[in-house]
From Swiss-Prot:
This is Phosphoribosyl-ATP pyrophosphatase. The gene is hisE. Pfam families: PRA-PH. It is found in: Cytoplasm. CDD domains: NTP-PPase_HisIE_like. It comes from the Bacteria. GO terms for molecular function: ATP binding; phosphoribosyl-ATP diphosphatase activity. SUPFAM superfamilies: all-alpha NTP pyrophosphatases (SSF101386). It comes from Verminephrobacter eiseniae (strain EF01-2). Pathway: Amino-acid biosynthesis; L-histidine biosynthesis; L-histidine from 5-phospho-alpha-D-ribose 1-diphosphate: step 2/9. Belongs to the PRA-PH family. InterPro entries: HisE, PRib-ATP_PPHydrolase-like. Gene3D superfamilies: MazG-like. GO terms for biological process: L-histidine biosynthetic process.
């Protein structure tokens, strides 16, 4: 099935990127003078979290521009930048893209409104769920 092939390739791309990011950690020999990822990780959470905020804003701006006739491909580029920096954050915190995909799979088919209400009722946010994921 084409959808299965796309899903497999997408997971493979995310897994390969996660492995590269992991290899850039200082503990694994990453050199902040030669690697952007190593530099972000070396600078700590403030550096990559700031980038996540910047990239999220750029996604919003690209989408707003697309509403006024700009090239929608810009949205894809900005989302790719956002995902990349989020993956740096995941690596820093010892988490993986597979855990995010598992959470999305868990939520598939459920009402977002009901999901949010349940988390609020249980006093749980997504951070608690991430800690419980394998």
């Amino acid at each position: 099935m084409p959808d299965d092939d796309l899903q497999h390739r997408s997971q493979d791309i995310l897994a390969r990127l996660a492995a590269v990011i992991e290899s850039r950690k200082i503990a694994h020999g990453g050199d902040p003078t030669k690697s952007y990822v190593a530099r972000l990780l070396h600078q700590g959470p403030d550096a990559f979290l700031k980038k996540i905020g910047e990239e999220a804003t750029e996604v919003v701006m690209a989408a707003k521009d697309a509403d006024h006739g700009a090239d929608k491909a810009k949205i894809i580029c900005e989302v790719a930048d956002l995902w990349f920096h989020c993956m740096v954050a995941l690596a820093h915190y010892g988490l993986t893209p597979d855990q995010v995909l598992a959470e999305l799979q868990r939520r598939a088919g459920s009402s977002g409104i009901e999901e949010k209400a349940l988390r609020k009722l249980l006093g749980r946010g997504s951070a608690d769920q991430a800690r419980e994921s394998p």
